[in-house]
Amino acid sequence: MCDNMKRLFFAIYINFLLLNSVSAQHKFTYRTEKLTTCDSIFLVDLSLDNEANKFVFDNVRDALKMAEKVRANGLKRKIRIFFSPNVYWVDDKDDNKIVMPEKPNSGVASGIEIKAGNINMIGLTGNPEDVVIAGNRGEKYGADRMYTMFDWVGDDLTMEDLTFGNFCSIDLVYKRNPDLDHEKRTDRVTGAKIAIVRGDRIHLKNCIFKGGKNTSPFNTINGGRHFLENCTIICGENSLPANAVFLNCKFTFNTNKPLYSPMQTGVVFLNCDFSTNEYKPFVMRKGGPATMIDCRWEVSHLRNELIYWTQTGQIDMRAYLSNNTVNGDSMKLWVGPWIPVDITNKPLLRAYKLADGTYNIFNLMRGEDDWNLTKQNTEGLKKIPTLLSVTQRRIQLENEVDEVNIGAKAYMFSDLNNPVPAKLTWDFEKPSYKEYLRITQDDQGRCTVKGIKENENEKNVTFIKVTSANGLESSSRINIYPRQLPPPEFTKTPELKRVKDELVLNYKLDLQNGLRDESVIKWYRCVKDKDGNPVKDKWYLTATTNVVGEPHNRYKLTRADEGYIIKASIATKHQRCEANPQVWSYTSDVIRNAPKQISYDVNMKYLPTQVQPDIVDGVWTMTVNKPADTKKYKWSVERQDSLVWLYDMGFDGAANSYGLTLAHRGARMMFTPESHIVYKAMSIQFDVDPCKEIGQGFAGNDGQYMDLYIMYNNRTNSGYALRIFRDKDYDHAVKMVFLKYTNGEYKKVCEPVAVTGFRRGCHISLEMKGKKLTASLTNKVQVPYDTLGIPAEASLTAVVEPSTFGGFGLQHTGSIGGSGIVIKGLKLDWK
């Protein structure tokens, strides 16, 4: 049956019900309003029978699905759904089945999916505690993925006088009738949302939202306007909406990062109260536009009397503040990567708060359609922008050569489509930057910048600031690179020489006037033909230069190099030029009499990081691999280049820590020593800084882990491994377990143990000797928060079948970026 015919029959059915059952419709009172149920007035009451023909329901799902049908039938007016006092579950609270996403590629499983707008859900008594709309599922606890009670598509949604709670990891306490109390599904904090919305004009009024991690009180994921007034929010990390205005709201945070990152024009907190026990409270994890006016923080374990605005900021954003307190005193804000702007005495304050003390909600919510949800008197109110955005956050220019034009635009809150006029002024963030940069401003509010320091050899980083007449600010980072010169020439041509057990590339460059050697040197080993003779038609990269300014001109030989020709390439460079074309140097003969490799202290600065799939003795194998046990989890392609690893700085918990980091999810490295040797013992010393801060290691428990292979046959994927993994039991710890691999299939050879030390400062020791396999994870970095009885250090011991292979490997299946790792050190020893 076509959709039009379905709608026709449904319309006939609805009209029949309305014409023949008016006298049977249910009558009730809301405040002083006497109401009768109809196609735009629903009543949900557990004490009544579920009678769709009367628009009376005993559950949330049927009411919303009827609203969806009525709306699809063409009804234009608002649908009001009233709830009598009770606890309403979106699905069976005691059902142990695992909810799967309805769409195969969706990352979210849902309780109720609905496509309908212009709906108002209302608690009948006016007390939000009387009506509880509840869910009881979270990621890995009743749901296969991240779970949301509502997955809603629709504009103009209003929720009023209701409590919404995902009680997967918190207890439901219903004061009106304790018989309806319900114990949480798990003690573990897990990803459990209340609602995600693809829509605009979302209004939450006098509601309570309760949850753990990822609470999501009707968060709009498409940038739609979102207004919460007189609401109470109790939540964990990454919970708050990213584009919203909060008025007179109360927050209790069970995390130090309740908001992941603001989007669009950001978030605004007006006259709100915040409470947390976290020792180092952040407003958000990653920076974006945000404003806080007339707010109060109560923090029981405050460190240094500071509120930390964000862990990772954006160059051009600002924190706009006025009249905020922490524990009764004026708010002290950690500047960090953001610059706070006190707007108390600036015209910008009027964008948020009028002279009479009322809050300018219309200015914030009006958008392109002048949405005036609070019925504010708009006479005489002008548009006051709240966001100033530069056209370029980061600029690179060549000193004394390049001129770059920069502009900025001002925007109203919740409207990025229509920039508004603003008078702009450009200046230096610091007076000292004038030594390196010249700013020229035109009469259109744009500026031109040029590097001006003569004969400068070094890169200089400067910041310029743009300010609007009403007090908005933004900035650009300008990296001024020295004026380019020709690359250096050789004064001594490259020559490969063997010095004991090393090859040394000797050369000299013509470097004057403070220039330094930043040449890129790479080392290669040839292949052999089927008869074992060296040939020069294919080369394996065995070492490289990963760090600018540290040319790797020495190559340590091992017995795996015997019988091969080694070559080195050098691309000469200093800090004021691009690299020259490569010049090659070769050993005059094959390598002979190299030492047996019994110890290998791996220097991450020189480790090859590009894809190299072949398994060859003495050569690193670098691949992106999706293990079979992650098959059911969809991975997105995160990079489109040949790198598997990067030598770079970490994120979040590994900020300012340099080492080898993931370039791809599924990054794997393997090293195969001399394969003809029978190995009796092997040990691994591994130093790592995970980016996750509190010991959880990975972004989720969807097949994310790290395996360290020991005494491994890389050719057959057989041997042993220590697995570090996150599972559903903990949000602040990982588990570690031994695995035995046989042709890529594995089984556990011990019981897992939990540990919280898989965070910055982690050291892992792994050893196999005969039948004894041991591992320890230690961390001497003390943390000020409660680890809930889980130790920071742990060890494992198992008796296993011996292995005679000496291969090493590392497989990481976690996300890149903030869920990755920084490998600081790796040492391998064999007997």
Residue ranges, per PLM feature:
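Bacterial N-terminal signal peptides
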Residues: 11-20
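Sequence-level preference for short, compositionally simple segments enriched
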Residues: 26-53, 57-387, 418, 461-463, ...
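Low-complexity, Ser/Thr/Pro/Gly-rich disordered linker/stalk regions
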Residues: 59, 82-111, 124, 147-149, ...
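Ser/Thr/Pro/Gly-rich low-complexity disordered regions
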Residues: 383-425, 430-601
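Short, aromatic/His-centered strand-loop micro-motif at the edge of beta-sheets
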Residues: 741-763
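Flexible glycan-contacting loops in extracellular carbohydrate-active proteins
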Residues: 787-824
